[in-house]
Amino acid sequence: MALPLLLLLLLLLPPRVLPAAPSSVPHGRQLPGRLGCLLEEGLCGASEACVNDGVFGRCQKVPAMDFYRYEVSPVALQRLRVALQKLSGTGFTWQDDYTQYVMDQELADLPKTYLRHPEASGPARPSKHSIGSERRYSQEGGAALAKAFRRHLPFLEALSQAPASDALARTRMAQDRPRAEGDDRFSKSILTYVAHTSVLTYPPGPQAQLPEDLLPRTLSQLQPDELSPKVDSSVERHHLMAALSAYAAQRPPAPPGKGSLEPQYLLRAPSRMPRPLLSPAVPQKWPSPLGDPEDPPSTGEGARIHTLLKDLQRQPAEARGLSDLELDSMAELMAGLMQGMDHRGALGGPGKAALGESGEQADGPKAALRGESFPDDGVQDDDDRLYQEVHRLSATLGGLLQDHGSRLSPGALPFAKPLKMERKKSERPEASLSSEEETAGVENVKSQTYSKDLLGQQPHSEPGAGAFGELQNQMPGPSEEEQSLPAGAQEALGDGLQLEVKPSEEEARGYIVTDRDPLRPEEGRQLVEDVARLLQMPSSTFADVEVLGPAVTFKVGANVQNVTTADVEKATVDNKDKLEETSGLKILQTGVGSKSKLKFLPPQAEQEDSTKFIALTLVSLACILGVLLASGLIYCLRHSSQHRLKEKLSGLGRDPGADATAAYQELCRQRMATRPPDRPEGPHTSRISSVSSQFSDGPMPSPSARSSASSWSEEPVQSNMDISTGHMILSYMEDHLKNKNRLEKEWEALCAYQAEPNSSLVAQKEENVPKNRSLAVLTYDHSRVLLKAENSHSHSDYINASPIMDHDPRNPAYIATQGPLPATVADFWQMVWESGCVVIVMLTPLTENGVRQCYHYWPDEGSNLYHIYEVNLVSEHIWCEDFLVRSFYLKNLQTNETRTVTQFHFLSWYDRGVPSSSRSLLDFRRKVNKCYRGRSCPIIVHCSDGAGRSGTYVLIDMVLNKMAKGAKEIDIAATLEHLRDQRPGMVQTKEQFEFALTAVAEEVNAILKALPQ
């Protein structure tokens, strides 16, 4: 009989409304304010943004205005972890509404720090602890209610079938009514509420051990036999249900109104409690939900509850006949009832009763006993009497539990004065700490927090008071850690929150080492204030700031952000540049350590010296290594070049075929036979020859075995220049070179010179454009070499070559041409044959920096056929590193005529540049003139475009030839203009023009030394 009466009492009493589970929503619909958007994408809707709340992230409608962060303690973090593990093990995800509801309830207990805007300069004042206390009491009461409904659901189903139960009939009518506007998210049925409520919503206490039959799962997964209480007799159960039905039938219906106690009222709650964003300095007042469940019941309801308690007190014998399971359920229901009444009394008044003037937490139960939060004294007296009756009934129930040896449920410890204990341990074994953690310093804290809600002792004379004292003795005793507390700490448990801290042997201190030694105290304090400002923490958090040489040390006190010394050190490293810019100091080192270790920090000067020494050592080693590598590389290059030179020379010394040698010697004899025998010889031939050869790199090497003696005749240079003329020309050249302004003006005048006529229409024809290597150097129409079209492979008379006249306009002295292209090689050899040339001067390498300068128009060995001209390589002689000499055997296959051609190839002159030394080029010119002497045919001179290097060589040779013939006046600028009248672009740069003047002066000086004094 007692158990059904208790259930009816639970329905009549107005405990704090439990948070209802959200109504079933289709899985695809996005609910506002969903949690977990930082961990899973796609939770927020199109008009929502994910706001970082410090835990999982919460969706808010754009623009987001409610910015706050949860303050998560280690105990709360463990509770969240357990809840997530249970949800995951059951198969729920962040998309499920049940997961959202459970985690929202878990986060409701956590204090918050509100921000003015997302980038707030400092944290707002956290929400008052009274709000968290209010929600905690609500959860504990809700836990008891949920367990009671789960265990006694069959009794409620049986009661729903009793025709005499007017109260339950009204409950069904309330369930069948359509939902009111704004309440569509909440269930109107007790069974629906229980089906959506899980044990996961209410975490067990710290010392609770859940039995295996209470593993986390939803009620819908339980079987009917698990929901039914295990009673010994079904007859006894029917007696209990019948008695409860009869009692409910005798109870008159309560009038609707503010104090309505219908089951529908128990399940009403607002869709979302409004949370205005207040200033941190203003205490937050939380409005009550719709149909405020915290309002006390009416006087008539209190009288009926009082009568019900008396009925329960008159039937102790029947209560002693209940089973263990029923007694356990009654204990849980009474615990939840008392907690709901305690909580209702504590939260009845405005915020002034719960919050003191200093913003600290007030003692809710004491405030309730003082009557500060009850607007109606009469109602308060009824509640007090009702509370005392519940105490006496609990004492009787406690005796029954002692007789049966029943164990209290982990979720319901609360007979009158619930005692909750939280343990926070941050101890770790010494062996598990790494060296880095030891250096940083580990705060060894072992704390035990006791929170005890004290209720004032009201005088009463009922006999149940003694029984209640016995019930207190039957509560679980304190743990070993509780018993180990000092006596003073145990006596002070009633004062509120107690913290026992076991400090570490030596407190860890943070330090920041700067480049300033010694560091002034005000600079050290300013640096610490900059760190505090960076972390948005008050400067008072940093205690015991000291300056040790170049370092500043500090300790981090307790703070609401739970920032430790190691966190400060890490933030300093991450924001090093910003701190250096703000403080004007250079941060060299940061860390955490004991004060004794900080005193032995190495002086900064020694660190800098060691760093400099290491850097200098590394630089020295690198230099030594570089020198060794360079020396080895140079040696290898020289050795390989000498080896290649020896191989090439030995290859040149090998005899070619007998036919080629015999043919070449026969050609040389024919050439000597046609030479006129009566050439005059100068009187000083040998002397001038010896003086001219003094600029060579060494003694003149003898011709190779593949060369004929007739090709290298030692005919002397004819010179008619006297001493006075030579000195006058030399002084003119020296003055020209020393006067840079004069040279500059002369070159500017040459650049402005325009040749007349200067038409190049033939070179610009469509069929001739591919035959030009450079479009900047095209032959003039009036001055170009004409080929015989009938002998040309392209039947064209065009080739990019210009005849250069000296004193005789009928016989050109030179032919300046471009380097042959693959398509113009046959034209080049045709020009050589038709012009009767026997000397070719080549002034460019084949390739420069990967760019082709000239085509390889001769065979490397043997012979090649170019149209009707067969070219056979006879010899190749390397005179020095700067030039070499090749001899070719040229044959016209149409006429079977043959001719010898000698090529002088200068290797060290690059495009738009000058040779490294004029001496090598002058020696090269002497070799060319010795071979050419006595010939009336022109010399073919080519480089890449046939203008820059070719023009410089022709200018030097032409001026020196004029002086050798006894010219009294020399005008190099006028000579260059004469060359540009015949081919454009001759001598392309000022450096090339200056080089020509230098070469002429050096050769004149050599001639003067050779003349008789």
UniProtKB/Swiss-Prot annotation:
Protein name in UniProt: Receptor-type tyrosine-protein phosphatase N2
Involved in localization to secretory granules: annotated segments: 1-419
GO biological process, one term: lipid metabolic process
InterPro entries: IA-2/IA-2_beta, Prot-tyrosine_phosphatase-like, PTP_cat, Receptor_IA-2_dom, Receptor_IA-2_ectodomain_sf, RESP18_dom, Tyr_Pase_AS, Tyr_Pase_cat
Chain's gene name: PTPRN2
GO cellular component terms, semicolon-separated: secretory granule membrane; synaptic vesicle membrane
Motif Leucine-based sorting signal: chain residues: 1002-1008
Record has Transmembrane helix as a keyword: yes
Site (Cleavage): K425, S426
Chain positions found as N6-acetyllysine: K968
